[in-house]
Amino acid sequence: MDLQRVAELALTALKREGADASQVIASRTALTEVNINLSEPSLLRSTQSQKLTLLGLWDGRKASTELSDLTPEALSVAASALRADAAAAPQDAANGVSSGQGIAIVRGPLESDLSALTDAAAELLEFRASQTPSMTIEEGVASHTRAEAQLLTSGGSHLSRTLGWYGLSVFGTARGPGRDGTVRSSSFNYGGGETEDLRSAPASSRFGVGDMMRELTRSIETKGIADCFGGKFTGDVVLTPMAVATLLEWLHEQVRDMALISGSSVYRDRVGEVIASPLLYLSSRFDGPGIAAISADGFVAPPLQLLNAGRLTTLTPSFYGSRKTGLSHVPTVASGWQLASGATPLADLMQGVHRGAVVGRLSMGNPASNGDFSGVIKNSFAINNGEVGAALSETMINGNVAHMLRDVVAVSAERIDTGGWCMPWVRVSGLHFS
């Protein structure tokens, strides 16, 4: 099946229906995966899928749909139905599609190495059996993906991508006797990521997966903050790379369409100002495994620095968001971000904490519009006088996300690279534990 030909036929079908502007994406994905279930290899399979996404505008009214039947007859039916859907949509002069954009990206291993997948799965199982036998891999996957797409618009844009990459993921818990002999279970945790070279390192050493599995075995027995610290206190958190990615997602949301259009962004009028610790340098990496520098609305996404020594350099409204707000359009991609490593070795970063916790996962819910939040810290360990101690249970922290970005006092030299993001450990002061 010729994806470009399908996309061209779809554009023609929408034009026949009188669309003023349109965008189509024809895509095909081939997935090969080795699955692990309950610490045993369970399934080897290959699947293929195809999809066509249609978007049409009639008199400022937008409608979109997806279909898996890519025959000319199905395209005609879908285009007609889309016009009917648009008739019931609200008019919005900000709706539009890209014009004159062009790029062709081909990158990564396009053919699957099945032996690399089976070797990676076997290495994960061997690591679990020898290093973390009390931990169960509830679900695990070693996979190869080949993803192709052709994006065309009525404005003459043509953006194509053909990407290949490998993925690993592990999800599990640990179970064993506590100090009193009672069998207990840890909370769940997970890890994983994408790479273009699966054989360059052991599977357990990638994406922090091995460390995550070890930490689960230490989390069978937990303590509350009353046992560890005597009760409520104000202290520091050391955010793991996964928790740092969660923290930065709030920042991304603040500079994207929803917050900018609603007026709830705390940063809309602060471009050029220092909004975070001078230790923070946040930039794009839109050439990471499985990532193409193409925005969802059909624009080439150039390299971007969002934070430079804590200074906010730009907002990131989409084409629609820019037309809605009057702000400059900045094309971006959802994943592919990196925070620069710091000068502090991780061991020193931990030793600098008087009282606090290493936070594996940060569950903040939906922070208030000003950044206030109250959340549970998960897969976390107490730090007392620089020593990492017991796993914590039922522990909450209260604070403000914007303040956390400003209160970063150390950034580790080490980072974890999952493909979609590359993050260090970050120490933040002044959080309230309860």
Residue ranges, per PLM feature:
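Dual-mode signal for accessory low-complexity, basic/Gly-rich regions
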Residues: 230, 254, 268-434
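Active-site bordering "gate/hinge" segments
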Residues: 1-292, 308-309, 347, 385-387, ...
